[in-house]
């Protein structure tokens, strides 16, 4: 029992001693947030043989190809589209595929679609447009009707419709590494009235008082299309909910569109049977446009108005061919005038691109003046940043859709307005610049994502953000004072400090404040990256590298991030983390500026400086107001050495030490000690949390100024507060952060420091003294041996 008791006491003492030791060595850690930690291995996927670590396609990269042969008919009275397609699916993946997934995006307009049933509402009011839409769904329903699915031999195939997706089970799996299969599908759907139901396609009929009742039809997502099968996700079979757009494979198309005989058709690709659908005069004008310097009408406004006056009884079939495109869209109307202009690209080794616009009389004169010229301008600017435009046409169509893009064709909305009372035709400044801007934007989408084929349904910013950035560049090259809505750093501040933000890397259907998030913020981020972080030369080279690497391929965000870093040689993980993965904003405050002067090492000079600083101070208010004499003034016996000696006079000991210290300096150290420059120290505080370069404009007493660009790495050891130093022989009078408003700083009220700058003295730090036991023990060695010998001290 005694033994156990003693053992217990010993154990308790042992534990107590460990506890005391633990308390003694407990580590205290400073708060630290590493805004510069690497994304590689943390948030980015591991590189593979398909996508390498440099951001380029790997040596085993593959992608599928899907070819379509489609016959489609538009029934104008019923607004019904009926079609049949033969699909050839080429499987370049290493996987055998027993079934195919297709997109039925028109199924979004079924009453029981996931999109319709998952819509939410808020507030205590409702727009009349919402009321009209709700009423329309009571007696109308959209969506595909699939009437037949057969294989290449005509045998029926089993299929399943899952909301906006179609799964086709193949009789035999399509083999990987080059296998192919053929599928034939027949289908139909009712076109939506775009102004009532909304969406990216549909029809618009001119039925108001005084209008002719004719319609414009814009066809998009109008046929079952193959979903993407990729190396990083397999089948991209996410339902269409409206916001997240499209993820599609490249392929070759032949499309025959049967429409009323007096319609004019615009479509993806090149018209194959102009001799059957255009008059000889129209064909001649189309040929003239190839080398014209101004747009040429192919179908004149007079011809369009004549067609509007009567309804043809027959039909015509327009045949189009498009190679290596990811989608196909069309527009059809008897209201269309059509102008064209050949755009000759830099280098001159390619045929001209036919920039063409299709518009009703209600769009004139804005569209004749600006649409086709905006297309030509877009091709010039975007190609200078990326690659030559590879397709034969680029088209802009005016109709019910305000702005939407498809290969070689775009739908754009702005028009003039006619006064209901006077009939006068006018247009607003917003309509003018809105038309130019939307044409630039939608035609710009030919590059992103029609050619650099990103996954729109997953990452909105990859096409909308990149495209809006280039749109901003094109707008400023159209007119220096172009009223751009997105791209200027100052214009993103309101969003950056707003509530309910989500990171740019959020999946498209979950994005809040869609326009600001998917368009404006990434466009601004890229503007800042180009103008402030990387510089134009490095940025432009890296962006071009990305565009050319992923030309006609499927990039991911990580391919973009890696390419921008690998090409430029700049580590940008901090930038991607802040702008793309987070919701912090930019707000850097200049809290304090202090001038520091070097301690000269001369006691008399230092005394003189201290005396001068003291004399600048006001006397004690209390001492000044006291009227009676002090004890020291009335009693001489209280006055001693300290009363008689001048307060700042150096002592004899100080002078001796200074002389000794000076004698110990090397010539280089003595020159450094004699520097009379000012060391200005700036206290910077990161209020917003987003680390950014610090742009500092310094103004001096002689009227000169300079701008210092401090890289974002200044925050790498403390992301919240740092002190930065600037050495000059000039006198600083003013300091301002972000003088050109280039960083999207949210609070300019804390960016300026003016007025009196306090001066303090920097003491010269002595180098650390190294222990030398041999010297302290009065010993020495000789050059030829480690043997020690006596070395009596001379002290």
State where each predicted segment sits:
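Glycine/proline-rich low-complexity spacer/linker segments in large multi-domain proteins
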Residues: 112-126, 188-249, 253, 274, ...
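Hydrophobic helix-coil surface modules that form long, contiguous segments used
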Residues: 221-235, 241-440, 469
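Solvent-exposed beta-hairpin/edge-strand motifs
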Residues: 97-154, 262-263, 699-709, 727
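A surface-exposed beta-strand-loop module
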Residues: 25, 71, 80, 90, ...
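Hydrophobic alpha-helical and helix-loop surface patches within well-folded domains
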Residues: 20, 32-53, 66, 320, ...
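Early extracytoplasmic/domain-onset interaction patches
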Residues: 24-103, 525
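Short, hydrophobic/aromatic-enriched beta-strand segments in well-ordered soluble domains
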Residues: 85-87, 91, 104-106, 179-193, ...
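Beta/coil-rich, acidic/histidine-enriched accessory regions frequently appended to metallopeptidases
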Residues: 77, 549-795
């Amino acid at each position: 029992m005694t033994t156990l008791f003693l053992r217990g006491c010993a154990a308790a003492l042992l534990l107590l001693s460990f506890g005391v030791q633990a308390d003694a060595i407990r580590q205290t850690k400073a708060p630290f947030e590493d805004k510069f930690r690497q994304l590689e291995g943390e948030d980015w996927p591991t590189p593979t043989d398909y996508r390498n670590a440099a951001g380029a396609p790997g040596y085993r990269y593959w992608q599928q190809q899907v070819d379509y042969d489609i016959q489609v008919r538009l029934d104008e009275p019923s607004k019904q589209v009926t079609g049949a397609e033969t699909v050839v699916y080429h499987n370049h993946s290493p996987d055998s595929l027993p079934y195919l997934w297709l997109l039925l995006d028109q199924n979004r307009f079924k009453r029981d679609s996931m999109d319709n049933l998952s819509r939410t509402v808020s507030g205590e009011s409702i727009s009349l447009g919402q009321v009209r839409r709700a009423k329309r769904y009571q007696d109308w329903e959209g969506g595909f009707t699939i009437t037949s699915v057969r294989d290449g031999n005509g045998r029926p195939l089993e299929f399943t419709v899952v909301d906006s997706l179609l799964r086709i089970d193949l009789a035999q799996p399509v083999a990987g590494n080059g296998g192919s299969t053929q599928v034939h599908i027949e289908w139909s759907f009712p076109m939506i009235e775009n102004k009532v139901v909304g969406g990216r396609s549909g029809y618009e009929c001119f039925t108001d008082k005084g209008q002719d009742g004719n319609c414009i039809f814009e066809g998009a997502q109008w046929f079952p299309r193959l979903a993407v099968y990729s190396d990083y996700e397999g089948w991209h079979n996410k339902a269409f909910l409206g916001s997240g757009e499209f993820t599609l494979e490249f392929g070759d198309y032949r499309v025959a569109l049967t429409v009323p005989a007096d319609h004019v058709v615009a479509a993806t690709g090149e018209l194959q049977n102009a001799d059957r659908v255009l008059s000889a005069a129209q064909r001649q004008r189309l040929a003239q446009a190839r080398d014209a310097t101004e747009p040429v009408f192919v179908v004149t406004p007079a011809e369009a108005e004549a067609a509007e006056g009567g309804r043809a009884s027959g039909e015509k079939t327009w045949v189009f061919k498009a190679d290596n495109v990811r989608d196909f869209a069309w527009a059809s109307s008897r209201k269309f005038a059509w102008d064209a202009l050949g755009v000759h690209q830099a280098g001159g080794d390619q045929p001209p691109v036919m920039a063409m616009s299709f518009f009703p009389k209600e769009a004139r004169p804005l569209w004749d003046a600006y649409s086709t010229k905006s297309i030509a301008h877009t091709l010039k600017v975007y190609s200078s940043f990326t690659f030559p435009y590879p397709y034969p046409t680029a088209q802009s169509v005016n109709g019910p859709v305000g702005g939407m893009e498809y290969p070689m064709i775009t739908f754009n909305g702005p028009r003039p307005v006619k006064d209901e009372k006077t009939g006068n035709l006018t247009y607003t400044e917003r309509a003018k610049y809105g038309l130019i801007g939307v044409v630039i934007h939608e035609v710009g989408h030919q590059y992103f994502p029609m050619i650099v084929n990103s996954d729109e349904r997953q990452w909105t910013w990859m096409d909308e953000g990149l495209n809006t950035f280039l749109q901003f560049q094109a707008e400023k090259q159209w007119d220096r004072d172009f009223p751009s809505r997105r791209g200027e750093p100052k214009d993103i501040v309101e969003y950056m400090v707003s509530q309910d933000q989500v990171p740019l890397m959020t999946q498209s259907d979950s994005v809040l404040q869609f326009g600001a998030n998917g368009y404006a913020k990434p466009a601004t981020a890229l503007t800042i990256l180009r103008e402030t972080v990387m510089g134009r030369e490095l940025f432009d080279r890296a962006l071009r590298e990305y565009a050319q690497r992923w030309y006609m391929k499927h990039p991911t965000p990580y391919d973009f991030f890696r390419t921008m870093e690998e090409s430029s040689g700049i580590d940008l993980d901090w930038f991607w983390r802040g702008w793309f993965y987070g919701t912090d904003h930019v707000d850097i405050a200049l809290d304090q500026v202090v001038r520091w002067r070097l301690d000269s090492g001369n006691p008399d000079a230092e005394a003189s400086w201290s005396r001068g600083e003291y004399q600048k101070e006001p006397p004690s208010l209390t001492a000044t107001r006291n009227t009676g004499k002090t004890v020291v003034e009335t009693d001489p016996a209280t006055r001693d050495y300290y009363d008689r000696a001048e307060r700042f006079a150096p002592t004899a000991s100080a002078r001796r030490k200074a002389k000794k210290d000076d004698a110990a300096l090397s010539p280089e150290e003595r020159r450094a000690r004699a520097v009379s420059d000012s060391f200005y120290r700036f206290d910077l505080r990161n209020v917003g949390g987003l680390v950014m370069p610090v742009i500092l404009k310094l103004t001096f007493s002689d009227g000169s100024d300079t701008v210092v660009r401090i890289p974002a790495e200044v925050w790498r050891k403390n992301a919240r507060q740092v002190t930065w130093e600037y050495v000059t022989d000039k006198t600083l009078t003013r300091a301002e952060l972000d003088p050109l408003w280039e960083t999207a700083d949210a609070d300019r009220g804390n960016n300026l420091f003016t007025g009196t700058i306090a001066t303090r003295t920097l003491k010269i730090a002595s180098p650390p003294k190294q222990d030398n036991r041999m010297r302290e023990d009065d010993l020495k060695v000789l050059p030829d041996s480690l043997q020690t010998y006596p070395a009596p001290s001379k002290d």
